[in-house]
Regions:
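Phosphopantetheine-dependent thiolation modules in NRPS/PKS and related acyl-activating systems
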Residues: 2-37, 41-47, 51-80
Length: 80
C-alpha cells in the first residue's frame, strides 16, 4: 500500500471518528489541529486505525507518535 493510499484511508477514519467530513489530515497534522481530538478520542482513533489497517500499535509506538505522518510511517512498516 502506498503512502497516498494510507493517507486516503486515514482521512476516512478521521472523518468517521470525529464525525466531520471536512477533516483532511496531512503529514504534520496533530491533535492541536482538530478541535475534538482529546485523550478519549485519541483512544477511539487508534482503535479505528488498527481496525481499518488490520494492525496493532504497541505502547512504544503510541507514545512516539507526534503527528499523523509518524502514524502513517508506523502503519506502512506494519502492512508492507
Amino acid at each position: 500500500m502506498s503512502r497516498e493510499e494510507v493517507f486516503e484511508k486515514l482521512n476516512e477514519v478521521f472523518r468517521d471518528v470525529f464525525d466531520d467530513d471536512s477533516i483532511t489530515v496531512g503529514e504534520t497534522t496533530t491533535a492541536e489541529d482538530i478541535e475534538d481530538w482529546d485523550s478519549l478520542e485519541h483512544i477511539n482513533l487508534l482503535a479505528a486505525v488498527e481496525q481499518e489497517f488490520g494492525i496493532k500499535f504497541n505502547m512504544g509506538q503510541v507514545v512516539s507518535m507526534k503527528n499523523v505522518g509518524e502514524m502513517s510511517d508506523i502503519i506502512i512498516s506494519q502492512i508492507n
